[in-house]
Design a protein with these regions (language model features):
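Sec-dependent bacterial lipoprotein signal peptides
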Residues: 1-15
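Lipid interaction determinants
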Residues: 17-140
């Protein structure tokens, strides 16, 4: 009986050391950070002369630009970022790549995208699109 109790205690002690390696990104981790888009679906941007950015403020306020500027109050839940009431300007850009990205970005944010922050890289992903941003805070 004592051996069983000792084995049970050892098993419980060891199980306490196991953790879930997949940790969801929280709103607090994003807050007060600015990110610049580096790639779309694994392809680097063709023109990086105009930084395409996304910033996170208080209460998960999201703002940034693609072809158009966008902003809205978001929510991060279970590793998903949603900005249900996203405001976006509606201009036509000379750059076809930016025009192609504008609508999908709006849809990603409104419908929800998986968000992952790993060191200096932010990834927004849906079933058909992946956007990778790098940390580019204006102040260290």
């Amino acid at each position: 009986m004592n051996k069983f109790a000792a084995l049970l205690a050892a098993g419980m002690l060891l199980s306490g050391c196991v953790y879930n390696s997949k940790v969801s990104t929280s709103a607090e981790q994003l807050q007060h950070h600015r990110f610049v888009l580096t790639s779309v679906n694994g392809q680097p941007l063709k023109d990086d002369s105009k930084p395409l950015e996304m910033s996170f403020g208080e209460k998960t306020f999201v703002s940034g630009n693609m072809c158009n500027r966008f902003s809205g109050e978001g929510k991060v839940s279970d590793g998903e970022l949603k900005v249900k009431e996203l405001a976006m300007t509606r201009m036509l850009c000379a750059d076809p790549q930016l025009n192609e990205l504008d609508a999908p970005l709006g849809k990603m944010l409104r419908d929800g995208a998986q968000v992952d922050l790993t060191e200096n890289q932010l990834t927004l992903a849906t079933a058909d699109r992946t956007l990778v941003y790098k940390l580019a805070d204006l102040v260290n």
